[in-house]
Amino acid sequence: MLTWPAPQIPELPGRGDVVRVHDSSTGRLVVAAEGPSASLYVCGITPYDATHIGHAATYVAFDLLGRAWRDAGQQVTYASNVTDVDDPLLERATATGVEWQDLAVEQTALFAEDMTALGVVPPDVYLGAVETIPPVAAAVEELVAAGAAYRVPLEEGAGGDAPALGDVYADVTADSAFGQVSRMDEATMLELFAERGGDPGRAGKRNALDPLLWRRERPGEPAWEAGSLGTGRPGWHIECAVIARAGLGLPFDVQGGGSDLLFPHHEMSTSHARLIGDGDVHGVGAATHVHAGLVGYQGEKMSKSRGNLVFVSRLRAEGVEPMAIRLALLAHHYRSDWEWTDASLTEGVARFETWRSAVSGNGGPDADATLAEVRAALADDLDAPRALAAVDRWAELSLAGTEKPVEGAPGVVSRAVNALLGVRL
């Protein structure tokens, strides 16, 4: 799958600090990646209703992580996916009378346009669910052979030419570490599993929390040949485990996404990753799990199911400067839940115009301290609001003209804002 064009990242003097992030599993700040390299997997979109502000906030947040790593001198490998076949996509295609493939292509392209406009660095490895069906099917077969997965009988009419081959589910009891990512009690897991695409009440399952690995063919649904599994398509969680393994290897440094992915998605995909290693060596998935807060609108979480969405593409079509949108997102710490309002965007536009005016001259206040403050803020759990405040102070002094101007300082600030915050002035 093709990504979008990569923005140019200016060179800055010196090096950034070691980046620490909040690990959702432990609740502690930890070094995001040790050593000269860093690896990141961010769960991608299901391509319908792209790209809303909640999506954008997540991808901008993890774009900051990649930028901070690069500034610290680390070689970054970033992988992501597109879930281009899944129940919600199929349901939307049916409801709107379009082919699901056409909807996926259209929305994936729109997402790429929005990410380009927002200055998000694209993944190095970018794979769709459809193009990775062969390795996903092989991983599911591996789990079945190891006794970590089992079949559940189908309802009448399902299964195509081989109805005796049931759906395949992972047995969560095969993973002794299951639950260590989210650290939730079983009652909470069951509640969230039911809310977020799971099927705890499915007859024939060994455990209510067992997740789907391979869904057999149903009438009117797309399906692919998969050897001993029978025709069908993959479950959601196993896709990410396999794509992360293919793109980054196991283990990798950080798995990121919205906080609503902590359970079941990241718990399940990490569990699968533990069990699909080669031979006796089992991967542990991500060393650190990092989650972005949720964005609300009109008093509720912004979500596709509620339909209360604000789209990046519509804002762009209305003539809103994409960098102002990015600044509106960066005004909130990535882990916080917050509400999108018209005032959020107004503040982003005003900040963008102020910064652009402040860097327009040949001289300005010394930039060294500002660069150091921005670097320190990002190294401290990607504290974008603190970084923005540092640039605000420099801009205020620059526009006031009360300090002796330092030649070249505006250029340093402009390059720093671009390289570290992803804001082109």
Swiss-Prot record:
GO terms for molecular function: ATP binding; cysteine-glucosaminylinositol ligase activity; cysteine-tRNA ligase activity; zinc ion binding. L-cysteinyl-5'-AMP binds at C43, G44, I45, T46, T58, N81, V82, T83, W236, G258, S259, D260, V295. Binds 1 zinc ion per subunit. The keyword Calcium does not apply. Zn(2+) binds at C43, C240, H265. GO terms for cellular component: cytosol. Keywords: ATP-binding, Ligase, Metal-binding, Nucleotide-binding, Zinc. GO terms for biological process: cysteinyl-tRNA aminoacylation; mycothiol biosynthetic process. A motif ('ERGGDP' region) lies at residues 195-200. InterPro entries: Cys-tRNA/MSH_ligase (IPR024909), Mycothiol_ligase_MshC (IPR017812), Rossmann-like_a/b/a_fold (IPR014729), tRNA-synt_1_cat_dom (IPR032678). It holds the Pfam family tRNA-synt_1e. It catalyses: 1D-myo-inositol 2-amino-2-deoxy-alpha-D-glucopyranoside + L-cysteine + ATP = 1D-myo-inositol 2-(L-cysteinylamino)-2-deoxy-alpha-D-glucopyranoside + AMP + diphosphate + H(+). A motif ('KMSKS' region) lies at residues 301-305. Catalyzes the ATP-dependent condensation of GlcN-Ins and L-cysteine to form L-Cys-GlcN-Ins. NCBIfam families: mycothiol_MshC (TIGR03447). Belongs to the class-I aminoacyl-tRNA synthetase family. MshC subfamily. This is L-cysteine:1D-myo-inositol 2-amino-2-deoxy-alpha-D-glucopyranoside ligase.
